[in-house]
């Protein structure tokens, strides 16, 4: 249809069955592999997906909490060879010059990139510590391939969040409310600052908002809110108050260092 195209593939692998929906959305370069695996009585098997891409780079970048880290794509030393895979959260990216490819996922954390081949670990059947942990069970997960211009800073961080926290649509009845047709509880200027957390404060009725800089850049950004905030206080990660910030017309100006984490408390 006009929203997305889907191709379904079923295949047998060893003692297991894999069903995949290859989903390409309109106006998007992201290709999703929506996967269901009936993981059979496997032993000493590691299921991976591999993507040979037309990109050459000596280093790949991997998503971690509140940032990302670069690692080599070669296994020239015993130390490199021992890291047959590394941990990452929502994506791994391989870029050169003005283009790159990101490999995204919604619940898998084992990656390896060697030369121009990007791989992600999907399921395991080890002998220890628990040989029955995953076998003879059904598993569902999604991973995606995303070609892009530039490097990871050109939309890859956002794409990782869009896959893991997809937009949910809802139909609501019309009303005569006071809100405008478009409204956000929170919004921040710039693509390099992410609103990671919004939650109730642990010790009082305040609202905790945690942001971080995702591209390794310095700069000033403006946080906007439609909440009736009376006071804004910056805290540490334990929510201990450190200093009061200025808010004017629902806007707060914030300076960020590369990969800096900032935690704010809104007093309503």
Task: Please give the residue ranges for each predicted region.
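C-terminal (or distal) subdomains of carbohydrate-active enzymes
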Residues: 1-268
């Amino acid at each position: 249809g006009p929203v997305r195209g889907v191709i379904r593939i079923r295949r047998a692998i060893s003692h297991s069955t894999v069903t995949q929906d290859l989903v390409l959305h309109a106006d998007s370069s992201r290709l999703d592999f929506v996967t269901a695996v009936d993981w059979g009585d496997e032993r000493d098997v590691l299921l991976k997906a591999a993507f040979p891409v037309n990109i050459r780079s000596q280093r790949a970048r991997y998503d971690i909490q509140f940032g990302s880290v670069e690692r080599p794509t070669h296994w020239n030393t015993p130390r490199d060879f021992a890291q047959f895979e590394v941990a990452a959260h929502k994506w791994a990216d391989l870029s050169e010059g003005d283009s790159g490819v990101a490999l995204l996922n919604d619940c898998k954390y084992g990656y390896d990139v060697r030369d121009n081949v990007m791989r992600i670990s999907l399921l395991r059947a080890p002998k220890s510590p628990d040989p029955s942990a995953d076998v003879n069970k059904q598993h569902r997960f999604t991973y995606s391939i995303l070609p892009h211009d530039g490097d990871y800073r050109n939309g890859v961080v956002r794409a990782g969040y869009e896959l893991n926290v997809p937009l949910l649509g809802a139909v609501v009845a019309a009303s005569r409310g006071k809100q405008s047709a478009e409204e956000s509880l929170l919004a921040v200027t710039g693509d390099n600052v992410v609103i990671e957390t919004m939650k109730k404060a642990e010790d009082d009725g305040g609202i905790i908002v945690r942001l971080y800089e995702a591209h390794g850049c310095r700069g000033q950004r403006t946080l906007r809110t439609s909440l009736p905030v009376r006071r804004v206080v910056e805290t540490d990660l334990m929510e201990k108050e450190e200093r009061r910030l200025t808010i004017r017309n629902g806007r707060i100006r914030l300076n960020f260092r590369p990969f800096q984490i900032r935690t704010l408390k809104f007093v309503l």
